[in-house]
Regions:
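N-terminal hydrophobic targeting segments that direct proteins to the cell envelope
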Residues: 31-45
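Functionally critical loop-and-helix segments that line ligand-binding/catalytic clefts
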Residues: 43-66, 71, 213-264
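Flexible, glycine-rich phosphate/dinucleotide-binding loops
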Residues: 107, 136, 204, 227, ...
Length: 264
């Protein structure tokens, strides 16, 4: 005797049903990842981020030896603070660019530069190299040291950066500006690109000549402010205590606009 075949009832999944399933899968993924994240990031809250900017960038050196490049992201909580906790995050943005320390003075090389440089490029993060300037050293030697360490730049790489933070012993404000201009002109002539100048808002006001600030893109450091105290700036380093997912500890965090980043 043939058994009567039972009809299988078709289940129709609506758009709302698909959304619910996706939300459930996402919640399960968070639950699985949660212990791992908590174990790695005990202190998960960092600086408050400024409003109105959409391109985040980091600047790194030997002090950030271990970076999970494929995981890099800036997460903020409900109060606008950076966080490493995915369960507290209400907004997530990618890290769009990274400035990497290459050299200092006339002979020092950052031991993690080449590794960071390679990994940033490999993971599609726009990269730039910076030189920490020493006003007590020969400017042309410093420029050549930077050029030899960094090597050629691709079209997608950011312009070279001159990091000016102090007037070193044995030099003056006048000497610093004269030497900085030699470095900038030497590097610009070599790469065919106008370098960026990094400094704090107060140092720019007190020490840098208009010949520098009016003719080169400015990357300004100014913490704890709604906007930087600098008339002409392209990139703003707004904190040195940010939490960035993929980096243990605190890190410098910067903002700019998409258009500015595109034009550099």
């Amino acid at each position: 005797m043939k058994r009567k075949r039972r009809k299988i009832k078709k289940i129709k999944i609506t758009g709302y049903g698909l959304t619910a399933i996706f939300a459930l899968l996402l919640a399960l993924a968070v639950l699985i990842a949660k212990p791992h994240i908590k174990e790695r990031h005990l202190d998960d809250r960092g600086c408050k981020v400024p409003t109105g900017f959409y391109c985040y960038g980091i600047d790194i050196s030997k002090y950030q030896p271990d970076i999970e490049w494929k995981s890099l992201m800036v997460m903020t909580d409900a109060k606008g603070h950076t966080t490493n906790s995915i369960t507290k995050a209400t907004d997530i943005k990618k890290v769009s660019y990274a400035f990497i320390k290459a050299t200092e003075g006339a002979s020092m090389k950052d031991k993690y530069f080449h590794n960071h440089w390679k990994n940033a490029g490999k993971h599609g993060i726009r990269r730039g190299a910076y030189h920490f300037f020493r006003s007590s050293k020969d400017a042309r030697q410093q420029a050549m040291h930077f050029i030899q360490t960094v090597g050629p730049l691709s079209e997608n790489d950011l312009p070279p950066v001159l990091d000016i933070e102090t007037i070193h012993k044995g030099s003056s404000r006048k000497t610093l500006n004269e030497k900085a201009l030699i470095w900038l002109e030497t590097v610009e002539n070599h790469y065919g690109r106008k370098p960026i100048v990094y400094s704090s808002a107060s140092f720019i006001e007190k020490n840098l000549y208009k010949e520098i600030t009016d003719n080169y893109p400015i990357w300004v450091a100014h913490y704890g402010a709604e906007r930087p105290r600098c008339d002409k700036w392209h990139i703003w380093q707004f904190a040195d205590n940010a939490k960035v997912y993929g980096i243990d500890g605190e890190v410098d965090l910067n903002v700019t606009t998409e258009q500015t980043l595109k034009n550099l």
